[in-house]
Amino acid sequence: MAVPYSLRALDDFQTRSAARHLAQRIASARLDAIRRSTAHGLRFVPESSDYTLTAVADGNGNGVRTTELVSGVDRVLSEPERIGTHFGGVSFGFHEGVPDADGNAAGSLDGVRIGASRLLVMNADGTASSGTLYLRGRGRSQYAVRVLGVTGRVRVLRFDAIRNRWFDV
C-alpha cells in the first residue's frame, strides 16, 4: 500500500517542482526585461509530443518576433531545454478529462496556451503576454503556470481531481 502512495507523492513533487521552475524562469525573464529595458521571453517549440523552451531577447526595440529570431535580429539566450530533462516524467499537456484553469473542457491536450507564435514575452514596463502553460506528471499530477498580461504576475495552480477544481499553490 505504501509504494503506490509514495510513487504518487513523488510524481506530484516532480510536477510541482517543474511548475515552480517554469514560474521562476518566467519571473527571471520579466526581471531581465525591466532591468535591461528590452523585451525578454521564452519561446516554446513543439518537438514530438512535447515542447522545448528557449530564453530569447529583443534585438532591435520592436519586441520579440519569431521571424526576427529565425533571421538573427532577435537573440536566442539559451540552448533549447525540455522540462522533462530536469524533472523526470513531466511534460507540457493535459491529462484526459482535466478542464483548463477557467473550468472549461480543455478541448485539446496541448499544454502551451500562449498564442500561435508560442512566445511568452515580458516587456520593459513589466507587462507580459498572457497565457497558461499546463504541466502533467507521469501519474495524475496536473499543474498550470499562468501569466497575467497587465501585471506580469505569475501564478502556479494545482488541479485537484477529487474536487475537479484548480487551486493556487
Protein language model features and the residues they cover:
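N-terminal helix-rich module
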Residues: 1-24, 31, 39, 44-169
